[in-house]
Amino acid sequence: VTNFFLDRDVINAVPHRLKKQIIFFGKWTRSDNTVGLQWFFEEVGAYMDKSIKIIIIGTGLPVEMVKRLKEYKNVEYRGFVENPYQMIADSLLVVSPLFSGAGVKVKVVESLACGTPVLGTSIAFEGIDKKFKKFMLEAEVPEDYICCINSLNISLDDRKQFKESFLKNYNEHSIVNFVTEKI
């Protein structure tokens, strides 16, 4: 049963064209997010295809980290974005290297609902049905991240079909449906 609401912007974000970019999405005042981002740039960033743009969305990224990220030509820190979901839908994937935290990660569910694959640790996918594993790309070591980013090939049609299937499942298992059935 899903116990949170998907915003209309998430539902309306449909992949139109795949841009050669990956997204990091989160509240950067949360240490589990910043630790994962820092790990990614220390262990993965130098080895991935430099033609792939890395976009970081969300508030609170520490000033020191923002300064370090400016050293990378293919990295852009956007900070707060009013509606990031179309950008997410049109990206190759969302990256979520989490090494701590508990429960379902809303950013992962929102990304999947946009039809966008998510590359992350097992912690990133806690509580999400494994039937969506084609778009839940689990990686624990840098080599797996590098390989996945540099070789990901999921078609636009597959992403649109996945989005439709994911949202159908989400709606069927939403807590709102269970509450209204009991009333």
Give a label for each model feature.
Residues 26-32, 103, 137, 167:
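Glycosyltransferase donor-binding loop in the core domain
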Residues 135-143, 149-156:
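Conserved acidic donor-binding segment of nucleotide-sugar-dependent glycosyltransferases
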Residues 4-68, 77, 81-84, 89:
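Conserved catalytic-core segment of nucleotide-activated headgroup transferases in glycan assembly
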Residues 153-183:
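A charged, aromatic-enriched C-terminal amphipathic alpha-helix characteristic of glycosyltransferases
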Residues 79, 96-102, 123:
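Short Ser/Thr-rich beta->loop micro-motif in glycosyltransferases that lines
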Residues 85, 106-113, 126-127:
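Short alpha-helical segment that forms part of, or immediately flanks, the ligand-binding pocket
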Residues 122-138:
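Short acidic/histidine- and often glycine-rich active-site loop of Leloir-type glycosyltransferases
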Residues 94, 107-111, 117-121:
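Short hydrophobic beta-strand element within catalytic cores of glycosyltransferases
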